From Swiss-Prot:
GO terms for biological process: mRNA splicing, via spliceosome; RNA fragment catabolic process; RNA splicing, via transesterification reactions. The lineage of its organism: Eukaryota, Metazoa, Chordata, Craniata, Vertebrata. Pfam families: DBR1, Metallophos. Residues 430-445 have a biased composition (Acidic residues). Its cofactor is Fe(2+); Zn(2+); Mn(2+). The modification Phosphoserine is found at S28, S470, S480, S484, S485, S489, S491, S494, S505, S520. One of its GO terms (cellular component) is nucleus. It comes from Mus musculus (Mouse). This is Lariat debranching enzyme.
């Protein structure tokens, strides 16, 4: 089947589907499935904008709300994962995945589904070592800390995925697996993104958690985004059986949805012709969810996953034939994902913009139904109960704060390299911290009742026309799923045949009209930069430490 893969979407669904339609007309047939690698931005209304980790002036409504309201419908089944710039309150409603709009499916914090016999897995968010071993404790209203930590990958999601034994065909992650750049054209990558050089040479660019999953799952395809550059690699895994050759993983990262950027690629993927043409639950994955239900943690404390070290009575949560049969019985022997999308929040109305927004922690009926059918815990219900207990003990709700990130030597993450302190800056991005310092008077912790001047949410009609024209300039480029590396000893063969067609889009003049985002591998310095305040003379007597951003 023909599968389209998109990099960072940034809410530009109209442009992506328009580009896809043009690719279909110029290509060799209709596309069966669209996979999006994060920064999807399923923004329904102004409250959702408030929960997206970008500076206020870069918050734009974009076009998802039209698909949420039913005004438009996705022309092709769309599956996506979360990145580091999302409507976090919306996605939090669906920790196990679900429909965010008709024909648009979110994989959840981590998840695996099947479509036409193809097994598709993914993990949302990005890696940040000091949050990796925490539970999922965040909930709206977010503050300046939790609005970021909520999209950081947690060890429990990686642990669940590592229980899988059956082959995974396609896997999605937002940030790249660490070291994957050594298996592609590293020289060309550094020519395009020279500011990656230090991390590439030190092997610190990318996610060690994703790298661990790549080594364990060894999928046929791995797609990522996040770094805003197209890059392909071919990784040869070591054989586990002497009589069989090691598996190969074709890696492809794509750019963001902007004119003249390689943000979309169409591939031919083998599938099972006898498999149903609708989305199905993956029984092995559901079995793992049931087995690991007792491991759910909704606190900010650091904790380790069970392992075979003599300290745990159980460390193997993989599925067995018997436990998978139990899951099939709970599904009534029908693994079809129900089309049970329901609106849980008001949709943005351009004619009636809301200046007052209220951030609410919602329980989504899709998640309620899913958990009831499988007999597992709704994480959001668990979080709400924890807050109620806190309210009962303290007599009042307290402002949610960062529960502390200081660690002792023995409590450190198993990944001792934190990319947050790296100094390289992507000039294609905007540093969130810098912008927050610059907008010091405007920024405040996200609150349940907050005034908000909604940014311009729709382009002017002439701008929209220009953008439509620019995004229609598509060319089929030579495939880069197979590339020659500058490291000859580790390079994939360059003589492979064509595997896909790249879709690029057009006019460079509109680049400045799109919101930028920071690079988050994450390049947040541990000690934030000190800046000069706008009216420095007024603050001449203030201690120097007060002039730095908090």
């Amino acid at each position: 089947m023909r599968v389209a893969v998109a990099g960072c979407c940034h809410g530009e669904l109209d442009k992506i589907y328009e580009t896809l339609a043009l690719a279909e007309r110029r290509g060799s047939g209709p596309v069966d499935l669209l996979l999006c690698c994060g920064d999807f931005q399923a923004v329904r209304n102004e409250a959702d904008l408030r929960c997206m980790a970008v500076p206020p002036k870069y918050r734009h409504m974009q076009t998802f709300y039209r698909y949420y309201s039913g005004e438009k419908k996705a022309p092709v089944l769309t599956i996506f994962i979360g990145g580091n710039h999302e409507a976090s309150n919306h996605l939090q409603e669906l920790p196990y995945g679900g429909w965010v709009a008709p024909n648009i499916y979110y994989l959840g914090l981590a998840g695996v589904v099947k479509y036409r016999g193809v097994r598709i897995g993914g993990i949302s968010g990005i890696f940040k070592s000091h949050d990796y071993r925490k539970g999922h404790f965040e909930c709206p209203p977010y503050n300046s800390s939790t609005i970021r930590s909520i999209y950081h990958v947690r060890n429990i999601e990686v642990y669940k995925l590592k229980q899988l034994k059956q082959p995974v065909h396609i896997f999605l992650s937002h940030d790249w697996p660490r070291n994957i750049y050594h298996y592609g054209n590293k020289k060309q990558l550094l020519k395009t993104k020279s500011f990656f050089r230090q991390e590439v040479e030190n092997s610190t660019l990318g996610s060690p958690a994703a790298s661990e999953l790549l080594e364990h799952l060894q999928p046929a395809y791995w797609f990522s985004a996040h770094l805003h550059v197209k890059f392909a690699a071919l990784m040869q895994h070591q054989a586990t059986d002497k009589d069989q050759a090691g598996k190969e993983t074709k890696f492809l990262a794509l750019d963001k949805c902007l004119p003249h950027r390689d943000f979309l690629q169409v591939l031919e993927i083998e599938h099972d012709p006898s498999a149903p043409e609708y989305l199905e639950y993956d029984v092995e994955w559901l079995t793992v969810l049931r087995a690991t239900d007792d491991l759910i943690n909704v606190t900010g404390g650091l904790w380790n996953m069970p392992e075979d070290n003599g300290l745990h009575t159980r460390w193997d949560y993989s599925a067995t034939e018997e436990t998978m049969k139990e899951v099939m019985e709970k599904l009534n022997h029908d693994p079809k994902v129900p089309c049970n999308f329901t609106m849980t929040a008001a949709c943005y109305d351009p004619s009636k913009p809301q200046t007052q927004v209220k951030l609410v922690h919602r329980i989504n009926p899709q998640t309620t139904e899913f958990c009831a059918q499988l007999g597992i815990t709704d994480i959001n219900v668990m979080i709400q109960k924890a807050r109620e207990e806190e309210h009962h003990q303290c007599g009042e709700y307290e402002q949610q704060g960062d529960p502390g990130t200081e660690e002792s030597e023995e409590d450190r993450s198993e990944y001792n390299t934190d990319t947050s302190a790296l100094s390289s800056i992507n000039p294609d991005e905007i540093m969130l911290d810098e912008e927050e310092e610059e907008e010091e008077e405007e920024e405040e912790a996200v609150s349940a009742h907050s005034d908000m001047n909604t940014p311009s949410v729709e382009p002017a009609s002439d701008q929209a026309s220009d953008l439509s024209t620019s995004f229609s300039d598509i060319r089929n480029l030579p495939s880069s799923m197979f590339v020659s590396s500058d490291d000859a000893s580790r390079s994939p063969a360059s003589g492979e045949g064509k595997c896909g067609e790249t879709v690029e889009s057009g006019d460079e003049k509109d680049l400045a009209k799109f919101p930028l985002k920071r690079l988050s591998d994450e390049h947040e310095p541990e000690q934030r930069k000190k800046i000069k305040r706008r009216n420095q003379a007024i603050y001449a007597a203030v201690d120097d430490g007060d002039a730095s951003a908090e």
